[in-house]
Design a protein with these regions (language model features):
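Conserved HGGG/HGGXW glycine-rich cap/lid loop of the alpha/beta-hydrolase fold
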Residues: 9-60
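Conserved alpha/beta-hydrolase "nucleophile elbow" surrounding the catalytic nucleophile
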Residues: 26-28, 87, 91-93
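Active-site loop/oxyanion-hole signature of alpha/beta-hydrolase fold enzymes
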Residues: 49-90, 235
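Flexible "cap/lid" loop of the alpha/beta hydrolase fold
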Residues: 97-105, 110-141
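Hydrophobic, aromatic-rich cap/lid helix
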Residues: 150-178, 194
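Short beta-strand/loop motif that positions the catalytic acidic residue
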Residues: 183, 189-191
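Conserved alpha/beta-hydrolase "acid-adjacent" motif
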Residues: 196-202
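Catalytic active-site module of serine/aspartate enzymes centered on a nucleophile-bearing elbow/loop
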Residues: 217-263
Length: 263
């Protein structure tokens, strides 16, 4: 287990591979652990990092640091501590909001973003996320009781419930995406069609996307496409990371596999 001391507190992370940096940021449920397969795939060409945000996994429970602004500050401190320059960000749920907010503030440091099951407008997050009483109950609901998903979320109960509630109830999703969208950083939005927590944006909600933003819907996935359909997700991740810097993710539709899934 690798740790770094930031703001006088322990932050846990894992790293694989060599090359240009990619940072994986987890959702409201779970930790770095469910990224293992994606990290292994990315690490063949990139240096893949995954960290636990404040209040999750083996990172310190620091109740004053649970807002999205504080999670963004954690990411910035981590990148500086690791000596990482321009980076690709792969964020999921909460992690996607952190990645987008980071981009809105430090766009010159972000090469591209993959935002997975991210609420891009207010009201896209299911009301159940705002009424959580136990993490175990939330895991059961969001995983659909799928054994492989539940196994990958084995350390989800390490999280501080307040860390989830603070960001769920922050109500900044629409604002965060709008600000990031103005930066014209290449951004691929990936949605699982069957995600119970975050609704899939419709054509009206994505009509104001930057020309460097693009959406792909994975029809057989829920909230965890990197687990529900790992092979397909990892191919998409590989193709996305392989795009030349500055290219729109819409270039992915040149490949037959993604053409019919484009929104």
């Amino acid at each position: 287990m690798s740790v770094v001391l930031l703001d006088e507190a322990i932050v846990h992370y894992e790293v694989l591979g060599k090359g240009r940096p990619v940072i994986f940021l987890h959702s409201w449920i779970g930790s770095w652990q469910y990224w293992i397969s994606a990290m292994q795939v990315a690490s063949t060409s990139f240096r893949a990092y995954a960290l636990d945000l404040w209040g999750f996994g083996d990172t310190t429970h620091k109740t004053t640091h649970y807002t999205i602004d504080q999670q963004v500050a954690l990411l910035r401190s981590f990148l500086k501590e690791m000596g990482i320059g321009k980076v690709a960000l792969v964020g999921h749920g909460l992690g996607a909001l952190v990645a987008l907010d980071y981009t809105s503030k430090y766009s010159d440091e972000v090469d591209r973003i993959m935002a997975i099951n991210c609420p891009v407008k207010s009201g896209m997050l299911h009301e159940k996320m705002r009424k959580i009483s136990t993490i175990a109950g939330l895991v059961e609901w969001i995983s659909g009781s799928a054994p492989n998903v539940q196994a990958a979320l084995g350390d989800a109960t390490k999280a501080d419930l307040s860390a989830i509630a603070t960001t769920v109830n922050g109500g900044r999703a629409g604002e965060i995406f709008t600000k990031a969208n103005r930066q014209h950083t290449p951004c691929l939005l990936v949605n699982g069609r069957n995600d119970p927590a975050v609704s899939v944006p419709d054509i009206h909600q994505i009509s104001d996307f930057s020309h460097l933003s693009h959406q792909i819907v994975l029809e057989k996935s829920g909230h965890f496409p990197m687990i529900d359909d790992a092979a397909k997700f990892n191919r998409l991740l590989t193709d996305f990371l392989a795009l030349d810097s500055g290219l729109s993710p819409s270039e992915l539709q040149l490949k037959d596999e993604w053409r019919r899934r484009v929104r």
